[in-house]
Curated annotation (Swiss-Prot):
UniProt source species: Xenopus laevis
Designated name of the protein: Insulin receptor substrate 1-A
Extent of motif YXXM motif 9: 706-709
GO biological process, one term: insulin receptor signaling pathway
PROSITE patterns: IRS_PTB (PS51064)
GO molecular function per UniProt: insulin receptor binding; insulin-like growth factor receptor binding; phosphatidylinositol 3-kinase binding; SH2 domain binding
Amino acid sequence: MNIRRCGHSENFFFIEVGRSAVTGAGEFWMQVDDSVVAQNMHETILEAMKALSDEFRPRSKSQSSSNCSNPISVPLRRHHLNHPPPSQVGLNRRARTESATATSPAGGAAKHGSSSFRVRASSDGEGTMSRPASMEGSPVSPSASRTQSHRHRGSSRLHPPLNHSRSIPMPATRCSPSATSPVSLSSSSTSGHGSTSDCMCPRRSSASISGSPSDGGFISSDEYGSSPCDFRSSFRSVTPDSMGHTPPAREEELNNYICMGKSSSHLQRGPQQRYQPSRGEELTDFDKVFRKRTHSSGTSPPTVSHQKTPSQSSIEEYTEMMPTHPVRLTSFRHSAFVPTYSYPEECLDLHLEGSRANHKDDGYMPMSPGVAPVSTKTNDYMPMSPKSVSAPQQIINPRWHSAVDSNGYMMMSPSGSCSPDNTNYSKIWTNGTNPKLSIDSIEGKLPCSDYINMSPASGSTTSTPPDSYLNSVEESTKPVYSYFSLPRSFKHVHRKSEDGNLRISANSGHNLYTEDSSSSSTSSDSLGGQDPQQPRKGEGCIQGKRLTRPTRLSLENSSKASTLPRVREPALPPEPKSPGEYVNIEFNDKVFSGGLVPSMCSLPFVQSRVVPQRENLSEYMNMDLGVWRAKTSYASTSSYEPPNKPVNSVCPTETCSSSRPPIRGKPISRDYMSMQLGSLCPDYSQVPPTRLSAKSITLSSSKSNYAEMSSGRVSDNIPAIAPASNSSLSEASRSSLLGQGSGPSAFTRVSLSPNRNPSAKVIRAGDPQGRRRHSSETFSSTPTTARVTTGPVSGEDVKRHSSASFENVWLRPGEIARRDSLQPSDHTHNGLNYIDLDLAKDLSSLDHCNSHQSGVSHPSDDLSPYASITFHKLEEHRSQAETEE
């Protein structure tokens, strides 16, 4: 095919072909790995062009220098991109005039070496200095000034106009003036083209000179600058006339973007078409003009008329990068390459207007979570709406909700879901099957209220959907208000407080701290669906009902950023959230009665505490001031005893055998082990060995101000429990935390999973003076730090909570800590930073618990808004604690 010119720009090389080409006249730009490859391609093609140059020579000659006097204005028409100019292979011409010198391989090599540097300008320049010297008079030599100016201008512009195309610079010539052309004034070539290529060598000038000055070809060699040499200078053909008339290539143009339109028709039409308007006449003359450009030595570069070629104008502006969708092609095809828009947006608008009717894609992907591209048209973009893809387990086919207001703003009402539409997005996250996870919208609250529902209660809203999919629970699905981006706000779930306890779990993670749901979304996450969620028995709290006043802020979920997806660790107990920033104060009308235990026993693995008052899992040290002195009626059967029956009686601390905090009903899956502050010496003899031994925190007032955590020694009464109850309770007890009911939970985290050793993560009690241990001061997590269990604690068992505030102690199920075996570590004395106060309103209500026996003063029936903690220990307890220490 007829290659008019070739060139390269950076990692693109291009070939301009004539009308004879199969594709019709146009340029082919090809991207290659790097500029070196592009240059090589350019040169290779150039050599081939040289070989063929003879046939073109006449044409290029036709433009001889005589034309110079009448510079033929050759628009850059070809240079749509100015890059073409390099490609403009004035090769034909050059070959003919300069063929010897230009052709010389050396020249070529030099040219290439300088190619990036070498500028067509040099061709311009070539005429410049040296040429003027030899040929000063000759029309061919452009005035030095012109060449220089051109050169400067050229340097400024990366691509020479297509005009250059005709000239094929002879690389060699440029490099060495003498080499450049026999004629060449070597000096001229050297001096030639002040253009960037100058440094190269005036290769061109000499070359052009070598040709008859009149011969445009010579100059065209300069033009050849299109070859790898620097486009800017080369941008214009050296030919004076071409320089004069050729619109100087604009440097800016190099920066222009190539239209990358997909459609081939586009491509063909596009470049030409887009530039056509400006170069219309040129197109007709395309080939001819190309050849015609000759340097008119007369013209000074300044005179060069810059006529904006279409390419230039379009190039100046950004070419639209519209992806042409087949649908839009037609519209794009016509408009896409219209160069008139200075900003791509304009083009876009234009195209969009045309195509919008059928193709609404505006090229922008809606990022709003709820809003998915509405278009059923080609879904080029993946909807980022979380509901469409994120929920791993259950992907509800994303429903394109038009929750966008007329202005295109997505409604952020959280209630519906993260997405504006309040459809079963919640379901998806909450797992429709497991309605429990999803939280019912708070009564009276429309799921899609305009205002975001900040209450975290929405079931595992924050937790990733998988977390939500715990287990199916028979519970009405509640829409989850999942704003994943939003930190959990506390939705107060109102629990029906049968006991009248005010405590509301503010925990965002679960709609309720229902016994079923693990204490928090996090716990649920970690716990996965371990526990078959059974409806709670004897739970005073009905999930549907919620107290208006949240009395409790649970850190558990809040500590965890709702935004972070949680990975379910089904087997592992979730680490307690590191932050114990909030004090969990629970105002319980009554201490939950041990009677709840039976229900607890029923669940093989209880993830959540049943205690009606305290369905919420408390992560903070739960200080039940009451001393459980109830007689140990807690028998093996007690697990099955009716709730009203006191499940556990606390034996005197001396015996320690039966003193265990009553299990609060169903296995409470409190994440943290509650530590009994009371003198109550929890003897979990009744508790199956699997049950964690209760740790009682004994405050040795004499010894230190810090709460001392010692695990109560369990008397060997344990056998008293019937094996059946053991089996049933064992698992439940594993999951349930000891002393969940009353004991202060010191963030001790007990692994609920039966297969793992339950772990108690203990946060050390801060000293009463209020000195707050810095988290860094945490006690070491070595097993020895707190000897919680008589059984060996493997190093792996002891895990340090991420927050350094917690000590994780793994209690092996079935191991019962003996009080003597447990010695409070110094650290533990300093331990608890956060205290969860359960003010039992009515300890007396517990049959088995004699509040009077406990040295602890219990708040009067009226809940005091402020909790006073009195660490009263019976003297026997105190002495006992001291002795233990």
